[in-house]
Amino acid sequence: MSEITLLAEVTAFLRQPHGQFIAGQREAGRGAPFAVINPATGQAIAEVTAADSDQADRAMESARQAFSQWREMPTLARGALLLKLADTLAEHREALAQLESLCSGKTITLARMLELDQSVAFLRYFAGWAGKVTGETLDVSLPSMAGEKYTAFTRRQPLGVVVGIVPWNFSIMIAIWKLAAALVCGCTIVLKPSEYTPLTLLRVAELAKAVGIPDGVINVVNGAGGEIAQRLITHPACAKVSFTGSVATGEKVQQSASASGKRVTLELGGKNAALFLDDLTPEAMVNGIIEAGYLNQGQICAAAERFYLPQVKLDAVLALLKDKLSAFAPGSPLDERTLMGPLANRQQYDKVLRLIQTARDEGDTIVCGGEALPGEGYFLQPTAVKVRSEESTLMREETFGPVCSFIGYRSEEEALARMNASPYGLAASVWSDNIRQALRYSEAIEAGIVWVNMHTFLDPAVPFGGMKGSGIGREFGSAFIDDYTELKSVMVRY
């Protein structure tokens, strides 16, 4: 094992006291301290002091006060600041990637590619919307009584203060999705990171201040549990909540936000499916399975967990998959050769182990993996499970780990019906060399995004969000405009 050397910037940052970033300043929390654990070792790497309710309120007031100035800034100037932030994240790419890898267990390669390179790309995309958020002029049909005329137009106006609740699996990239969309529309934002990954957004907020984003436009409030998030959501200054996370927590967020009439965007994951058609070889199927289900230890909201394979090829595919996964031995996320790191926190580690044991108890077949690795850290073997039926827990409950469930089908129509029987619908994929058939199935699958011969690829130009129990609203593309602006109509008589 050969780990990269941590940059001095990273070690110096870790030694600092950590709390909040409010009104352009770092400040210690007034709540309880909590440890930040490196999931590769199980050891604390830093301590963060949580905000108390007064600090949460002050962050919201800071964002509200900054809103009036920020919304009046010329739109191209807002876009220019987002471009500067993108350039700064690119300059600090390695330091931020190392910090994220330490906190989340993400391999350093993925941290560089996804957390940083994708964040930079999304910032630049959203910056390009500056000056392009437009309304319409409208012809109206009101009668003229004395020669008067009428016209009307619409305009998009920023909502106000956005509360962005960010999960632990992609703490920089998902925060940037929310931050960039809010800021380019003229909103300000208060970000609440997960207590498992609270550090990187503090550094991003510092860099945002350094490039000239005014104080109060971006605030970061830390805290364990849901109390601080609830305080932010219910604050009178909150105009919108953007949440990414679990279904159970998302339902609570929706209830709290809706009770006071606030806009809400929810991206909740679920139980995503992948369908492999019979024309593919077992080798092609296995390559697709690894891409769809095991990237980042399966800790991706859109990752596939249910795999539908032709019954006649099921055993051959699973035998080949078992051989391929043997090369994915988990290792240190700071080793550039590592393909699979630890799970991001102890709670998730315990949950995944519990679900694997449930599969055993229910009579499912563990094809490979299924065990924790000895030693320190939250490492699990990549696991493939051949389930008995659709009633297996692993076909219904989100695992969010390196565990994929496989079941055979005898007709493609049967497989489609079983895929759509889920209460969730964030993402799915169809794999086939028959593009005509794959495109037809993409129309029938009940999911917010359907990939063909690919999985878990996101592009800022393509809207992303869930159907059914997997969420409300869309991110990216032009769809984000509806969620961060108010559509105002103006009618004129002249």
Residue ranges and their predicted role:
Residues Q43-A46, C238, L275, I356, ...:
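Conserved C-terminal structural/oligomerization subdomain of aldehyde/semialdehyde dehydrogenase
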Residues M1-A40, Y125:
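Hydrophobic face of amphipathic alpha-helices that form TPR/SEL1-like repeat modules
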